Amino acid sequence: MSLTLAIDTSTDVRVGLAADGAVLASSAVTDPRAHAEQLMPLIDRTLADADRRLADVTQIVVGVGPGPFTGLRVGVVTAHTLGFVLGVPVRGVCSLDAGAAGHEAAGEFVVVSDARRREVYWARYAADGHRLAGPFVTPASELPDLPVTGPGAALAGGESTPLDGGLLALASPELPDMGLSPLYLRRPDAEVPTTRKSTLLQPRLAPGLAR
């Protein structure tokens, strides 16, 4: 049985385990400043809730945004590191695509997330969840006149919905593989000096988890 670990740090920190078309367990932390500190403990908790071990994972899927620089970097680097340690494939998926796949609609719609600075990340979708345009980052006032969904929908006059429903979609092989390059869409708020070695994102694995 294949076991997919799904990670998305484009908004909050969200983790899910999926097998045979069903989510076995999922967890989330809503503090946007705690991505680096919370991701590995959240993965451990989700595995425990599903009575699985990290060594049972057969593939990893990670949301590559769009989203903030630091949050996306945490998720993508952690997924890449775990994939290397476990020797399993890692796919990158547009986080908005996953949100669209979990949304029922009668016609075209827009998935929106908060980009801060009075802007939103968004993409336009057909009723079947196929992406028609985007992703973009613009003021909410520039969104097309279509129904909106997603965690930033309230910024456009809609009802915000978390991307929880997209975790199963994130693990679906039907979503296009975007690679592991994060979709920042704009430069980070703060630049890390190039001469300083980054200490971010070194997941600490318990002994015996590697093959």
Describe every region a protein language model picked out.
Residues 35-50, 96:
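Short, well-ordered amphipathic alpha-helical segments that serve as non-catalytic structural scaffolds
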Residues 1-22, 34-37, 91-211:
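Oxyanion-binding and handling regions
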Residues 25-28:
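Short amphipathic
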Residues 48-55, 83-93:
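Phosphate-handling active-site elements
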Residues 61-89:
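DPxDG-like acidic metal-binding loop motif
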Residues 43-59, 144-146:
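Phosphate/pyrophosphate-binding loops at sites that engage ATP/ADP/AMP, CoA/4′-phosphopantetheine
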Residues 39-41, 55, 181:
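Intrinsically disordered, low-complexity proline-rich regions
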